[in-house]
């Protein structure tokens, strides 16, 4: 099986190299948010740290990284060009994300693979379609995700012992906040993983309430190990108060809303991308039992009530941001226009949202050796707190939840409707099919706006 992974990994790396080259040849102008990111990084490369573009919503982590990365490239290529000149080549800066995705991320997640029965293939984590697109653009998402996964891995494996691993994890977690502010929620989740791991080491599993009490006691007992994460939360609270909000700039377009339906969007994306992991006849039977047959049919009443609640949320807590309606360079524009904004969509989406919500929670709770009930609650709670306040329907916000979900959910052993195929291999081919499709659309489907004549537009997540 290892040889299969080597072959498939080689195929994916070669594919990424080809795509990067094609993007470099065809996307010669900064694309969407790259306009701000590239310009700000180039400003930092000129050592003008006093200049800041107030349209940028995230901290300067990407620009500091880009500046350092460009300096490293300059030195290892022995170029006589200045740092400013190197940074003016936007493909050099773009390659920082490709390096992160193909080198750094695999090294981190490989340490989380269980040797006897691997719960995932490293190449599949790297090939996730929501990540894949941004390996070739200068966006914050890749390194924001890498640093959170690195922080998580240190807490889970503790290669340097409890205290040292926790403090390094906390430092890396702090660095992740310089790329995306909402990572503060995932820092709290990582802290819950640490405490729960310690709880299981020192206490037998008992009832949920007693486990919760033991969790709190363990957090107090291990306060020294938890301190780096508490410090991050305190520092972030100070930042929010001083900054008068979470976003750095463009605050008018990023006001907080109660966008509860975003949870259903997230769970639907997560279920769609991970179907090779969970889809089985046994799961379908379990869902039917949960919705209709369970408790002598009483579950039917609960299901009807859930459906009514979902419709209420759709009708009252769907936020339609002006960007969603105006920007046809994102898949969400077409998802909204052709699916979610159709007549009766608030009816036919109910069973989809119901199933996807149940599926995510069910697959987490049925994974032996995965998350415990306590950390499932902190994970789901993290998703809620991260995405519900956001007015934007933005799949990039689902990257970290999807990564964590996939790191912990083990593929079912059941055949795919009677067909004998490795679930990991099926997942790889599914991801590759999606990656190829979004690459073809991105490179081949070109259009222009009347407001920007001659400037080629493309479609991404």
Curated annotation (Swiss-Prot):
The terms under GO molecular function for this entry are: dolichyl pyrophosphate Glc2Man9GlcNAc2 alpha-1,2-glucosyltransferase activity
Q: What intrachain disulfides are recorded?
A: none
Stretches assigned to coiled coil? none
Glycosylated where?
316
EC numbers: 2.4.1.256
Q: What does the entry give for GO biological process?
A: dolichol-linked oligosaccharide biosynthetic process
TM ranges: 6-26, 92-112, 119-137, 138-156, 159-179, 220-240, 260-280, 290-310, 344-364, 368-388, 425-445
Assign the protein's first listed, main location to one coarse class. Answer: endoplasmic reticulum
- What name is this protein filed under? Dol-P-Glc:Glc(2)Man(9)GlcNAc(2)-PP-Dol alpha-1,2-glucosyltransferase
What does the UniProt keyword field contain?
Endoplasmic reticulum, Glycoprotein, Glycosyltransferase, Membrane, Transferase, Transmembrane, Transmembrane helix
Which reactions fall under this protein's catalytic activity?
Answer: an alpha-D-Glc-(1->3)-alpha-D-Glc-(1->3)-alpha-D-Man-(1->2)-alpha-D-Man-(1->2)-alpha-D-Man-(1->3)-[alpha-D-Man-(1->2)-alpha-D-Man-(1->3)-[alpha-D-Man-(1->2)-alpha-D-Man-(1->6)]-alpha-D-Man-(1->6)]-beta-D-Man-(1->4)-beta-D-GlcNAc-(1->4)-alpha-D-GlcNAc-diphospho-di-trans,poly-cis-dolichol + a di-trans,poly-cis-dolichyl beta-D-glucosyl phosphate = a alpha-D-Glc-(1->2)-alpha-D-Glc-(1->3)-alpha-D-Glc-(1->3)-alpha-D-Man-(1->2)-alpha-D-Man-(1->2)-alpha-D-Man-(1->3)-[alpha-D-Man-(1->2)-alpha-D-Man-(1->3)-[alpha-D-Man-(1->2)-alpha-D-Man-(1->6)]-alpha-D-Man-(1->6)]-beta-D-Man-(1->4)-beta-D-GlcNAc-(1->4)-alpha-D-GlcNAc-diphospho-di-trans,poly-cis-dolichol + a di-trans,poly-cis-dolichyl phosphate + H(+)
Keyword Ribonucleoprotein belongs to the record = no
Q: Pathway involvement? A: Protein modification; protein glycosylation
Family statement drawn from the similarity comment of this UniProt entry: Belongs to the ALG10 glucosyltransferase family.
Does Glycoprotein count among this protein's keywords? yes
What gene name is given for the protein in this entry?
ALG10
Q: Looking at the UniProt record for this protein, which Gene Ontology cellular component terms does it annotate, in alphabetical order?
A: endoplasmic reticulum membrane
Q: What does this protein do?
A: Dol-P-Glc:Glc(2)Man(9)GlcNAc(2)-PP-Dol alpha-1,2-glucosyltransferase that operates in the biosynthetic pathway of dolichol-linked oligosaccharides, the glycan precursors employed in protein asparagine (N)-glycosylation. The assembly of dolichol-linked oligosaccharides begins on the cytosolic side of the endoplasmic reticulum membrane and finishes in its lumen. The sequential addition of sugars to dolichol pyrophosphate produces dolichol-linked oligosaccharides containing fourteen sugars, including two GlcNAcs, nine mannoses and three glucoses.
